[in-house]
Design a protein with these regions (language model features):
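Structured mid-to-C-terminal alpha-helical surface segments
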Residues: 1-51, 60-70, 76-312
Length: 312
């Protein structure tokens, strides 16, 4: 295989991304957005390496080929950690950051929200080529999360194969613990806003995907579930169930929007069965698993191996 030719100019880069979009059966705008989000993320982690990646992009970094998301979800794990101050710190670090022929403008339209007691603020990033806006994406900045301190970096490879001298093909991120992400998604499935139940079909899909692909620590997951249910003031069911009668039709419609969904998760019944295998033993009130590791290959919990005792 010949080495890909370097692409340094805007026309060269966009031509390469369009070609990649055609190969992947994606729209050019989807690939443009993914490229610039990853370039931005690599620069942020290099400039201000105290940010932790969560949400769909975190899952995509852990499981290449996971569903695409259209924004970044981030939080700071060192001061300032409140959502407003953290957002200001991100703007200070990245506003008007130049990378190759592109400039990132980070704006704060003050779109704030609350999930339980977790406050978020949404920033908008505009990617300019010269003075022209070429792409844009959003960043959701969360404040004051209860989560373990992340110390180990996760190696990430940029999604596209282009050789772009100013855009790192490989970079590292701090990744939100998968047990906490599972707890967030489980609780979000049962959170009620107003009078309507949850319609977060993507969370069931993602829980199933985690069950198929990643190891999970039982003790850390139980701790995270207890924290999130307390923060959101909700009581989780003793086993995973569909939140409402809307879910079979709603989930089917959601899966229809995905690019190459996993065959094991195409129906709500198969997704629920896969997610149940991971979560029911932890949610159980009668005999919950408290120690062990989830094996995605075996799709079951295994006892945690004991540490070897002192040699005699």
């Amino acid at each position: 295989m010949p080495n890909p030719k370097p692409r340094t100019t805007h026309p060269q880069i966009t031509a390469g991304l369009r070609q990649f979009a055609t190969q992947q059966k994606l729209t050019p705008n989807t690939v443009y957005s993914q490229f610039f989000r990853e370039v931005f993320l690599a620069e942020l982690m290099d400039t201000d390496p105290v940010w932790v990646l969560k949400g769909g992009t975190n899952l995509y970094c852990l499981i290449p080929g996971a569903r695409h998301t259209q924004d970044l979800d981030l939080y700071r794990q060192t001061s300032p950690t409140s959502h407003r101050d953290a957002a200001d710190a991100l703007i200070s670090a990245m506003h008007r950051m130049q990378v190759g022929p592109y400039t990132f403008e980070v704006r704060n339209p003050r779109k704030e929200s609350v999930s339980g007691t977790i406050e978020n603020i949404q920033l908008t990033v505009i990617v300019r080529f010269g003075t022209t806006e070429f792409s844009r994406f959003n960043i959701d900045v969360s404040g004051d999360l209860e989560a373990p301190t992340v110390t180990e970096s996760l190696a990430v490879t940029r999604t596209d194969p282009l050789k772009v001298p100013f855009a790192r093909q490989h970079f590292t991120v701090l990744s939100y613990p998968i047990e906490n992400q599972l707890a967030d998604k489980t609780c979000a499935m049962y959170e009620i806003h107003g009078t309507r139940g949850s319609t977060r079909y993507r969370d069931l899909y993602d829980i199933g995907l985690i069950a198929l692909e990643l190891e999970v620590d039982a003790e850390k997951l139980r701790t995270a579930l207890e924290q999130q249910s307390r923060i959101r003031a909700l009581t989780l069911p003793p086993r995973l169930v569909l939140p409402s009668d809307e879910w079979p039709a709603g989930y089917k419609k959601f899966v229809g929007t995905l690019h190459q969904p996993r065959p094991e998760l195409r129906t709500v019944e198969s997704a629920l069965t896969t997610a149940e295998a991971l979560l029911n033993s932890v949610l159980s009130l009668d005999n919950p698993i408290t120690v062990g590791r989830w094996s995605p290959e075996q799709r079951q919990w295994s006892p945690q191996p004991k540490s070897p005792g002192p040699s005699t």
